[in-house]
Curated annotation (Swiss-Prot):
The gene is LTF. The lineage of its organism: Eukaryota, Metazoa, Chordata, Craniata, Vertebrata. One of its GO terms (biological process) is negative regulation of single-species biofilm formation in or on host organism. Belongs to the transferrin family. The keyword Metal-binding applies. Residues 1-19 form the signal peptide. The keyword Transferase does not apply. This is Lactotransferrin. One of its GO terms (molecular function) is serine-type peptidase activity. Disulfide bonds join C28-C64, C38-C55, C134-C217, C176-C192, C179-C202, C189-C200, C250-C264, C367-C399, C377-C390, C424-C703, C444-C666, C476-C551, C500-C694, C510-C524, C521-C534, C592-C606, C644-C649. Poly-N-acetyllactosaminic carbohydrate moiety seems to be needed for TLR4 activation.
């Protein structure tokens, strides 16, 4: 079976070099039958040589999680619900390998939880109250946890007063929820079809139990909606004409055909995963063990021992019997990224109080990059009356990850990062709009975005330096992966040279976010104490537009890649910063692609490319709310806001361009909720995609895994 690309296999082989001298993995078994299978596995692996396996027995998945966190075991396989538990404090375990299901031609590492209804029934997801519901079983992901978690805001549930089942029983007019206590909650068993003691039973003795049972409950007309997984409809209705009689309820309160489950689902549920410690977790060794084990004992590999099989009368020991193999999970993926925001939200909704849930739904959590942005964000939060609160990360990629996990809601990004965020599933919400002579008569909020000019700036005194003579010079960049400072100039250079060896093109550089040991970080300065050199946030003195221009102004670099406004904002007395207050605009020139140079006043005829405006991004399910809150916030704290400058200004910073660009006039609406490709434009997306062939980022690798 060929389920692994060479890159994944080579990553597994890397464990040979990086593993501890004693190549042993302590596997945690949660029962005597599991321990017995583990012992059989141990014996067979011993014959193959390293890595070896030792079997540790505990009484439950939670006990295994504790053993791994306490360094008394190394690995265990968990379902998605327990992966969530394992990722919480104090355990902080992360998934390192995922089980693969499906077929060799169509391998899957997740399924979709969906709400199925009959075509012609006249209600949407937010109109389910009073309808009749069919569930596969109490406590099951697709049949209970996810739909009930998503419906939680509509439930009249006081946590301390009653169990959740009581609120669900009142919400639906009648239900079939196998495994529930029918005496305590008769309404939740009312639609079930089992006879006598088998009514509402937690087994196939109840005809409406399980995925197919819940769908049959809908088919028979007993219920109005069935909560199942996407394959259930296809398995029970192989003919398209029959499937066309059913539809899916979408989170945006619309309906879609049953084959549109990738766009219309309640949540994506990942497969079972092997978890390990986040620090000193032996993940390379664990992957080597799994890779060798599946090669020798995987599907149809061995009669004497089957890794994905259990003795008669037993099921899913150590791994699911239906698994085909494993795929390695990228190191950037923690438990929250693995589970996804929709699934996480559903689980959180089942745990939080009504007050916590309301607060989370109404506020917007903004992600600040670095301490200076955090400080400004805290001021914003205080002035907003906590309508906006703050999360903080050390890099933009880490902020994007927080939004993906639902730990933050939004941030404003440069076009290069919009590309990354878009590849990860986030969407543009509003654009930073500057003053415009072309559309001066239009309301800024409704005005089309015009983009900005990416330029290469040099000192006038550096005579003879042109675009064609940059090789071997010293360069200043806003940050790796940013538009004007990296993507545009380095994309042009890569196209001209046919090489991705950027560290060899320039003699030295400051490109925050690059490898600190490389020449691309040689010119960076860090903070006032010389710490955090080359970090992609405001701790690095030469980070961002202003930082890259300062790098040039202080004669550290020969050329700065910035936007055309940067020179104007930091010369001729426009900036009060000590390093900039005496700078003259006439002392700088622009490099044109034709090999000439021009004054900075002639940027319209001497630029590298037109770059898309910075834009706010969020998850699609939060986009409308983020826009609503931002419109209100800029009415208070925008350029012409009633509380700016007296209390707080969104588009003004003590240093430069914190949270938003300082030259932003307003945040503008984006008509029709465009995709990231449409917002950035085909040419720009193609250019970045080509540049990413030179090098990708851990976050892009993680998102490629999560969205495949």
């Amino acid at each position: 079976m060929k389920l692994f690309v060479p890159a994944l296999l080579s990553l597994g082989a890397l464990g040979l070099c990086l593993a501890a001298p004693r190549k042993n993995v302590r596997w945690c078994a949660i029962s005597l039958p599991e321990w017995s299978k583990c012992y059989q596995w141990q014996r067979r692996m011993r014959k193959l040589g390293a890595p070896s396996i030792t079997c540790i027995r505990r009484t439950s998945a939670l006990e295994c999680i504790r053993a791994i966190a306490g360094k008394n075991a190394d690995a265990v396989t968990l379902d998605s619900g327990m992966v969530f538990e394992a990722g919480l404090d104090p355990y902080k375990l992360r998934p390192v390998a995922a089980e693969i299901y499906g077929t060799e031609k169509s391998p899957q590492t997740h399924y979709y939880a969906v709400a199925v209804v009959k075509k012609g029934s006249n209600f949407q997801l937010d109109q389910l109250q009073g309808q009749k519901s069919c569930h596969m079983g109490l406590g099951r992901s697709a049949g209970w946890n996810i739909p009930v978690g998503i419906l939680r805001p509509f439930l009249s549930w006081t946590e301390s007063a009653e169990p959740l089942q009581g609120a669900v029983a009142r919400f639906f007019s009648a239900s079939c929820v196998p495994c529930v206590d029918g005496k305590a909650y008769p309404n939740l068993c009312q639609l079930c079809k089992g006879v006598g003691e088998n009514k509402c039973a937690c087994s196939s003795q109840e005809p409406y139990f399980g995925y197919s049972g819940a769908f049959k409950c809908l088919q028979d007309g007993a219920g109005d909606v069935a909560f199942v997984k996407e394959t259930t409809v296809f398995e029970n209705l192989p003919e398209k004409a029959d499937r066309d009689q059913y539809e899916l309820l979408c989170l945006n309160n619309t309906r879609a055909p049953v084959d549109a489950f990738k766009e219309c689902h309640l949540a994506q549920v990942p497969s079972h995963a092997v978890v390990a410690r986040s620090v000193d977790g032996k993940e390379n060794l664990i992957w080597e063990l799994l890779r060798k084990a599946q090669e020798k004992f995987g599907k149809n590999k061995s009669q004497s021992f089957q890794l994905f099989g259990s003795p008669e009368g037993r099921r899913d020991l150590l791994f699911k019997d239906s698994a085909l193999g494993f795929v390695r999970i990228p190191s950037k993926v923690d438990s929250a990224l693995y589970l996804g925001s929709r699934y996480l939200t559903a689980l959180k909704n089942l745990r939080e109080t009504a007050e916590e849930l309301k607060a989370r739904c109404t506020r917007v959590v903004w992600c600040a990059v670095g301490p200076e942005e955090q400080s400004k964000c805290q001021q914003w939060s205080e002035q907003s009356g906590q309508n906006v609160t703050c999360a903080t990360a050390s890099t933009t990629d880490d902020c994007i990850a927080l939004v993906l996990k639902g730990e933050a809601d939004a941030l404003s990004l440069d076009g290069g990062y919009i590309y990354t965020a878009g590849k990860c599933g986030l969407v543009p919400v509003m654009a930073e709009n500057r003053k415009s002579s072309k559309y001066s008569s239009l309301d800024c909020v409704l005005r089309p975005t015009e983009g900005y000019l990416a330029v290469a700036v040099v000192k006038k005194a550096n005579e003879g330096l042109t675009w064609n003579s940059l090789k071997g010079k010293k360069s200043c960049h806003t940050a790796v992966d940013r538009t004007a400072g990296w993507n545009i100039p380095m994309g042009l250079i890569a196209n001209q040279t046919g090489s991705c060896a950027f560290d060899e093109f320039f003699s030295q550089s400051c490109a925050p976010g690059a490898d600190p040991k490389s020449s691309l970080c040689a010119l960076c300065a860090g903070d006032d104490q010389g710490l955090d050199k080359c970090v992609p946030n405001s701790k690095e003195k030469y980070y961002g537009y202003t930082g890259a221009f300062r790098c040039l102004a202080e004669d550290v670099g020969d050329v700065a890649f910035v936007k055309n406004d940067t020179v104007w904002e930091n010369t001729n007395g426009e900036s009060s910063a000590d390093w900039a207050k005496n700078l003259n605009r006439e002392d700088f020139r622009l490099l044109c692609l034709d090999g000439t140079t021009k004054p900075v006043t002639e940027a319209q005829s001497c630029y590298l490319a037109v770059a898309p405006n910075h834009a706010v991004v969020s998850r699609s399910d939060r986009a409308a709310h983020v826009e609503q809150v931002l419109l209100h916030q800029q009415a208070l704290f925008g350029k012409n806001g009633k509380n700016c400058p007296d209390q707080f200004c969104l588009f003004k910073s003590e240093t430069k361009n914190l949270l938003f660009n300082d030259n932003t006039e307003c945040l503008a609406k984006l008509g029709g909720r465009p995709t990231y490709e449409k917002y950035l434009g085909t040419e720009y997306v193609t250019a970045i995609a080509n540049l990413k062939k030179c090098s990708t980022s851990p976050l892009l690798e993680a998102c490629a895994f999560l969205t495949r």
